[in-house]
From Swiss-Prot:
SUPFAM superfamilies assigned to the protein according to its UniProt record, in alphabetical order: Hsp33 domain, HSP33 redox switch-like
Protein name per Swiss-Prot or TrEMBL: 33 kDa chaperonin
Major location (coarse): cytoplasm
Pfam families reported in the protein's UniProt record: HSP33
Entry similarity comment: Belongs to the HSP33 family.
Subcellular location: Cytoplasm
One cellular component term from this protein's GO annotations in UniProt: cytoplasm
Functional description taken from the UniProt entry: Redox regulated molecular chaperone. Protects both thermally unfolding and oxidatively damaged proteins from irreversible aggregation. Plays an important role in the bacterial defense system toward oxidative stress.
Amino acid sequence: MADQLIRGTAADNGIRVVGVISTNLTEEARQRHKLSYVATAALGRTMASALLISSSMKKQEARLNLRIKGDGPLGGLLVDAGPDGTVRGYVQNPGVELPPNAKGKLDVGGAVGKGFLYAVKDFGRGYPYSSTVELVSGEIGDDVTHYLATSEQTPSALLVGVFVGAEGVTAAGGILLQILPKAARDESLVAKLESRLGQLSGFTPLLQQGKSLHDIFQDLLGDEDLNIFPETQMVRFDCGCTFERMMGALKMLGQDELLDMIEKDGGAEATCNFCNEVYHADVDHLSRLVEELKADAH
């Protein structure tokens, strides 16, 4: 099934619901960064969360950054996503592997440890909005839900998951339910949604059963005046880094540093943290930058 995101409302527009399938982009991240099983799960859950949250940002150029910094062996991770359906991210220590937790699952919480979640929303105009919350469990879903409830003051239920095995990622994605102010006063509705989500064994088992996002929406909200929007948005891993951007960054180092690279290293190499793409600049490239800087100085 193609990576995609759909949206809808329910309960007379009192509930916003967003769902995403991110299997292929999570597998791409796993391959690019050579991620362990537990690192794949941590990054995949965070990428799904970021896509779900950023989908409600109005401007296409808006971006959401989710950074998780814990004291566990994973170190930390950073994800960048936008309402255009693009996402990228990386893990500080991608090779970390841990034994399964007490439930026999990948121990994402143990890999992340205790720490904080930092969120920055850049709306494409004005100043970015940033907030920080303490991690609840390190399992990502709980932590992002806590962020939404405390920083955005929106009662939310988030279910994200990644299934990764010897053949790679075979299921990944999530669903976000947000209760808007007009429905938040209906305690029975809130309790019903919490109960239904609580009965689910996770998000990836639903995909493995062959359910589509439409099916999952119907199962959860079919009796609550569900309205699924007709647009299906494609989502993908996309970094946006280019050789030209790398050259621009090198140019900022100045003439002396560039001349030193030419003399000592015979060129330069840069690796993008977000996608692990490696860019090479040879002596000719660096020499042109030096000439440009000389021309700019006159």
